[in-house]
Amino acid sequence: MNEERMQGRTVSLEHNLYRIIASVASGAGVWSAGTIPGTGCLACVAFIPLILAIRGAPNYRLVLSCGAAFSLCWSLLKLECIAGMGFRNGRFDSHAIGWLSLIVLFLVAHTAAVASLYYLWIVRGWPCCLAHSTTWIASELIADGSMQRGFGLSLDSLRLATSQLDGGVFTQCADLGGSLLVSWLVTITNGLVLDLRCREPLPTNAFALCIRGMCFVIAFSLTYNVVRPVFLKTLKGPTVVLVPSKWGVLLSELTTRELRADLFIWPEGAHAETLNTDMRIETSLAECATVLDASIIVGCKRLGDGQRGLLNTACHYSPDTMKFDLSDKQFLAPISEFVPPLGQWFKIPDPATPYVPGKSRCWAIQGGWRVGVGICNDATFAAWGMSIMEKQPELLIVISNESFSPSNQMRKQLLATYQLRAIGTRRSILRCAMEGTTCLIDGRGCIVKQNRDWRPPTTLLICEMPLTQSWSLYQSCGDSLSLVITCGGVILGEYVRLTSRRNR
C-alpha cells in the first residue's frame, strides 16, 4: 500500500511539474512569437519527423538532445534574420544588439517547449500531443497577426485598416492584450488536456499548481508590457515637426507655440529664393534655427556648376555646429517603377537648362541621430535606398512637392513606393509634401501618422520617433503590392505591382 501511494505521489509530482514547465514554456513561446515572420508555424510543422524518429524510445536524454538541436536550428534561423537586419558594413547597429540578446531566451524557451511535446508523444500518446501542438500553432498565428510582425495573410485587411491609426495605438494594445490573452488560453488548454488525458488519479491541488504556472506567465507578460513602454520612453528618439507649407508662413506660429523639437522640416520648394543669386537663405535659416533651438531642413533651388543647370536642393542648418550644408537631388523622372500605358516615357522638356545630378548626404541632428535626405522622386529609385544606407542613417527624410501630379492615383502610387523603400531599408521615413500626404512611415511600411489636408490652414505633423526599428518582408497597401527579398542586409530583389484604375 505504501509503495502504491509513493508511486502515485511520484506520478502526480511528475504531472504537476510538467504543468508548470508547459505553462512557462507556452507563455515564453507566445511572448517571443512574431519576432521573425513565419518561423513559428514552420517550426511547429518541422518537429513532427523528429517525433516519429524517436517514437517508442523513451530516452529522456535523446528527447532533450533532439529538442535542444531543433531549438538551436530555429534560433539560428532567427539569428540569421536578425543579423541581416542589423549587420551592415562589417558592424552591428546598436538596435540589433538588443535583439541578439534574446537568442538565449529563444534557446531556453523553445527547448523546454519542444521537449515537453516529445514527452507528451512518448508518454501520453499522439492525441494529447496533437492537441498541445494545435494550441501552440494557433497561438503563434494569433500572436504573429495581432502584433503585426508576421505574414498575416488572413489578417491582411485588418493590418491595413489598423496601419492608418494615429500613434500606433493598435500595436500597443496588441502587445498587452494579444500576448496576455493568448498565454492565458494556451495555459488553460494545456491544463484541461492533461486532466482529460491523465490515466492516474490526481491530487486535489493539481489544478491549483497549474494556476500557479499560469499566474507566472501572466505576471511575466504584464511586467514585460508595463516595463517595456516606460523603458522605451526613457530612450526615445528625436521629436520631428513636419511643416507642409511655404517658408515663412508659419514661422510666427512656431515661435509663439514654443514647440520643443529636435528637427523642423519644410517640403520641396518651400523657400522661394534661389541660392547663388540671393544668399539670404542661409541668414534666414540661421535666425530661425536659433529661435527654435533645433535643426532645420528646407527645400529650395540653386544653380548648378557653371550656371548651367538647376538643382533641386535641401538646405540644412544646425544650431549646434553653426554649419550650413546642402544635399542635392540625385535622380530625375521618369520614375523607375512606373510604366506608362504606351510603354514609353515622354522626353524631359527645356533642354536649355539641363539637369545636373547631385549627391544625397547624411546629416547629424540634435540628439545624435543621423538622417538621410531624399528630394522629390529620389526615393522611388532602389539605387537611392542602397546608396543612402551605405552612410548608416537612422532615419530617412523625403521632401516633395506633388503639384506636378494632380491625379490622386499617382499620389497613391508614390506613397506606395515610399512604403516600399521603408521596407527595403528597414528605416522609418518622414515624408513632408507641399501637396499630397505628409506622413510618418515606419520600418514595416505602415503609415503611423499622416496629414492629408494639405490645403490652408496648414496643420503641423509632430512625430516622436521611436528608438527601435522593426522590419517586414511583405506589405500590401490599397491597390499596390510590394515584395522585398533580403538576405544579410542586402536587397536581392524587389517587385512592385501598381494598378492604374481610373478615379471615379
PLM region descriptions:
Residues 190, 312, 398-401:
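Asparagine-centered polar/low-complexity signal
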